[in-house]
């Protein structure tokens, strides 16, 4: 098959899962075309089955905000015709499902029918999509998708509760390719991060308020008073600078390492003894799954789709 995948090309869970799905489909000898505004961060290898098509938005002074949706839908139309695309798979409802629908209708005018799968990931529903300015468009886009999937039962329930959805929603959980982490344990150089006596605690996120970054630091501060420990903070976002200041104010600056964004998540997790995920809201919690595959127990909040991933008393513990 010729498959077009539309996603955000960033370090967030939706972009990571979309990229990993495309890579897996390419290994099955499908032709996979990623269509977005820059090459996805996890897409570090293009080959005869994986293609990237950049969406460019020309600057025009009349527009206060450049119309990415129009550029994306036009790019989709061109790609479907040029590469004989069989199916569109759009990840994250805003604006991808809406742009996908526009592309479908333009193609129908030329007698071309292209099915569209929309995968809902979380904040596209619970935060951004639920805003009154976007809600009608999100509802319309979901209802006019051919197939709709959600990454968790919790997100499916939220979608049906918040929107007037007529389409059936199938739950397809996020996944990780276990084969890519199998050698990390023998290559792990834990001594670079901490002494033998110290425990290593890790947090990975986009450093937004919903991730409760300040609580991560408070939790670690309590732990390090009882147990010699280091905290690894992986990611970038609006609370990064504030988190660095708080670590300094708490007097734990020398015990906290800020990595920024990284494509070497597995190599960082192999150092870790514990993974913290105290999110206020989480539709799945891909970072927790990444920790588990690296044999790291997870302590997380008991919210959203996290209990579907982190099984209390099995893979870690849930906290109220």
Give residue spans per PLM region.
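Short hydrophobic beta-strand element within catalytic cores of glycosyltransferases
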Residues: 297-300, 310
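Conserved donor-binding/catalytic core segment of Leloir-type glycosyltransferases
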Residues: 149, 195-220, 232
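Carbohydrate-associated surface elements
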Residues: 154, 175
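N-terminal strand-loop element at the rim of the active site
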Residues: 5-11, 23-68
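Nucleotide-activated donor-binding/catalytic signature segment of Leloir-type glycosyltransferases, i.e.
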Residues: 244-260
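Conserved acidic donor-binding segment of nucleotide-sugar-dependent glycosyltransferases
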Residues: 312-313, 317-320
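Aromatic "clamp/platform" in nucleotide-sugar-dependent glycosyltransferases that forms part
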Residues: 261, 280
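A short helix/loop element that forms part of the nucleotide-sugar donor recognition site in Leloir-type
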Residues: 181-195
């Amino acid at each position: 098959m010729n498959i077009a995948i539309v996603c955000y090309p960033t370090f967030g869970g939706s972009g990571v899962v979309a990229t990993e799905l495309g890579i897996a489909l390419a290994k099955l000898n499908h032709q996979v075309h990623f269509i977005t505004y820059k090459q996805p961060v996890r897409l570090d290898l293009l080959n005869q089955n994986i293609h990237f098509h950049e969406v460019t938005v020309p600057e025009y002074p009349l527009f206060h905000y450049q119309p990415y949706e129009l550029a994306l839908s036009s790019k989709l139309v061109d790609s479907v015709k040029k590469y004989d695309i069989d199916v569109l798979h759009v990840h994250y409802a805003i604006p991808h499902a809406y742009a996908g629908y526009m592309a479908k209708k333009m193609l129908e005018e030329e007698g071309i029918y292209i099915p569209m799968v929309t995968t809902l990931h979380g904040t596209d529903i619970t935060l951004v999509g639920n805003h009154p300015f976007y809600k009608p468009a999100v509802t319309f886009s979901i209802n006019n998708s051919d197939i709709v999937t959600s990454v968790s039962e919790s997100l499916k329930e939220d979608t049906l509760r918040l929107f007037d959805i007529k389409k059936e929603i199938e739950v397809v959980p996020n996944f990780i390719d276990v084969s890519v982490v199998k050698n990390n344990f023998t290559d792990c150089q834990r001594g670079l991060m901490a002494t033998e006596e110290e425990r290593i605690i890790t947090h990975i996120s986009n450093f937004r308020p919903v991730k409760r970054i300040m609580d991560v630091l408070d939790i670690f501060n309590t732990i390090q008073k009882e147990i010699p420990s280091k905290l690894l903070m992986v990611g970038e976002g609006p609370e990064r600078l504030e988190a660095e200041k708080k670590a300094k104010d708490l007097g734990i600056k020398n015990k906290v390492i800020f990595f920024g964004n990284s494509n070497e998540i597995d190599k960082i997790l192999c150092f870790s003894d514990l993974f913290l995920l105290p999110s206020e809201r989480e539709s799945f919690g891909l970072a927790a799954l990444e920790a588990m595959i690296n044999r790291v127990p997870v302590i997380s909040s008991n919210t959203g789709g996290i209990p579907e991933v982190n099984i209390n008393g099995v893979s870690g513990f849930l906290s109220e």
